[in-house]
Amino acid sequence: MKKFLAIFLAILMVATLAACGGGGETPETPDAPDATEAPVAGEVHGIKVEAYATMTADDLIAKLIKDKTAPTVEEYTALMETIELAELDERFNFADNATNDALIQLNSDGATLPNILDCANAVIANDSAKVRAYYYSRLGNVFFDDTTAYYAPIKAKVISETEPIAIAYAFRYLASNFRSDAEFCDFVLANKDNENFMVRKWFSSAVTFLQPADKTPFIDAMLELLGDEDVDVVTEAALNCGTLEDDRLVEPLAKILKDENLADAHDDALTSLIRMWYDYPAHDNYSEAAYKATMDYLKGDYASADLPSWLGLSKMANKGTKFDAWAAEATYVNNDEIVEAAKNIFEDEAKARLVRTQCISIIGVFGDKADLEALQATIDKVESASDKSSYQSKLDAELAKK
């Protein structure tokens, strides 16, 4: 009986030690994320949305990653999937969140990160459009083409997307990778009239990268978007349509520039027009119609001190190494006309400093030394010391180039 009792006590002691982990405590490590676990509303990988809202990057890394110096593909995927818990506004901007902070921190800490393409199969199968969209944004930093194993499955998922956020993010971040793919181009075109304004907005961004067999339907779509009911859509279309280099776009761009209620779109509309005829620094474009529309804008009379748009004007305030060769072919350009228009704007005391400063540079590009020196009398009359200093500095810099 005593022998039996001794054996029983020995077995009990071994079992107790095993349960306690031996003589000392072992730090807890996170379980590997289970990709097969059933989704729970408001919860991702055991993290509830309420808890996520207060989590830091360190908290999230500690929760999901065993070795933060070398996260596995599964762990890295799980980390990206927590973006489902982040807040998102109507413009598809994520609020500051622990997911993004954690990914940035891992990178800045020098962790050995998995190839993000290796996360593709898991992420594109995720039911959350937010998660897929976020993944597309991360893929935007990676080059991959049809020689890459993941190209086909990623494209197949992208062109089947129906959720606005996933479509918009694919347009914004993946158009470069799929630029020559006929199916992707068809997918983009099919969404030109999407009810969501952000999809329509990023449609025009995608078009700047695409290389379809026929650009005509895309130009037609851009013509429609330049008259869209949403200002954000119009502004983005105005910025990007110049890359299409089609004179049919000149008239709607000029119409935007004639409307001071669309002043927020003037920067972009003027940028596109100038690209079509001046195209700094490449100097490869020669649209006479775009030049004439630009000059009409510069000669316009505007109530706002900020018009004409200084940022748009800046696109013709410098010249590249091909300027002389371009100028020899751009016979439609009248340097005297440009100088006169810029001079008139500069002499208008009601115009903002940035607008007037750009005009000095424009005269430096298209005028001669005498044209620049003629500005001195106006500068001498400027009452604001800071404005006068700014104009004088710019004038001196331009004169130094002559």
What residue spans do the PLM features occupy?
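Amphipathic alpha-helical scaffolding segments comprising HEAT/armadillo-like alpha-solenoid repeats
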Residues: 57-58, 71-89, 110-123, 144-159, ...
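Structural detector for internal amphipathic alpha-helices that build alpha-solenoid repeat scaffolds
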Residues: 47-52, 58-70, 74, 78-81, ...
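C-terminal motif of bacterial Sec signal peptides marking the signal peptidase cleavage site
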Residues: 16-19
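Post-signal peptide N-terminal segment of mature Sec-exported envelope proteins
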Residues: 28-62
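Bacterial signal peptide processing site
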Residues: 21-24
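Structural signature of alpha-solenoid helical repeat scaffolds
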Residues: 127, 158, 162, 195, ...
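Positively charged n-region of N-terminal signal peptides that target proteins for export
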Residues: 1-4
